[in-house]
Amino acid sequence: MKRIILFFIYLLLIPCWICAQTVISEDTTSTQYAEAHIIASFVKSFNHGLKLTLEEEIRSAPAHRAHTTIGIAYTSVQYISLSAAYVLKLYGDKGWDNPNEFLRHRVNIDATGQVSLGQWKLSLRERLMLDAQAGEINLQEKNRVDYILRSRLQAQYSIPNKPLSIIGKMEIFNTLNAKMYGQYISELRPEIGLQWKVDKNNTLNLAYRYNYVYSRNIHILDSGNLTLEHEYKYKHIILLTYKFDC
């Protein structure tokens, strides 16, 4: 019983400790740039609604990144699908001396609901994203694993008698375990694109995405005070995607 009381006292003291810290400087930085993403994916369908996906994504300067994804999806009923994926991220601008710097790991857990209305197909996807930080970090400033909820609403219109579809998307990123000062929306991703169903197995997509990114960086000084940096990025992205289904 004594331990339980001490534990609750500790919880009550945490907000006091945070409030006692003083933000001695607060800076804002912003950048705007354009980049291209090239994506190739292979999807293998099995019985009982199972699908296996392998995907490679290359991002151009200034990001210089590559994402390799392996995932599995299960459609239990016509309107709902569940999936999970592992993503290996490679950063080309971090140097090649330390794998903890240029390699990162991510896990995605998805639930998607969709419905068809004539030529329209509407879907809502909720994704829990776990982003792992490797190497040495200050755990008072950053998390070893960031938890982010990504909510995406998508509308697809199939042009009658044509192998073409127009696709519009809106995705919102919400932090779930940000350090201090509460959670916040970290990304907004409106997107518009055109899909061409070449044949039964091959699909091409061309899209434009505007990516608003906000991050809040906290630095704890030796004195115990804080410096707070608000970082904004505005990205204009062209995406070219090829998918092979079998």
Briefly describe each language-model feature range:
Residues 46-53, 79-84, 118-122, 161-166, ...:
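Repeated loop/turn-to-beta-strand initiation elements of outer-membrane beta-barrel proteins
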Residues 64-120:
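Hydrophobic/aromatic-rich structural module bridging two neighboring secondary-structure elements via a short loop
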Residues 111, 232-246:
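Outer-membrane beta-barrel "beta-signal"
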Residues 125-225, 229, 243-246:
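Outer-membrane beta-barrel transmembrane domain signature
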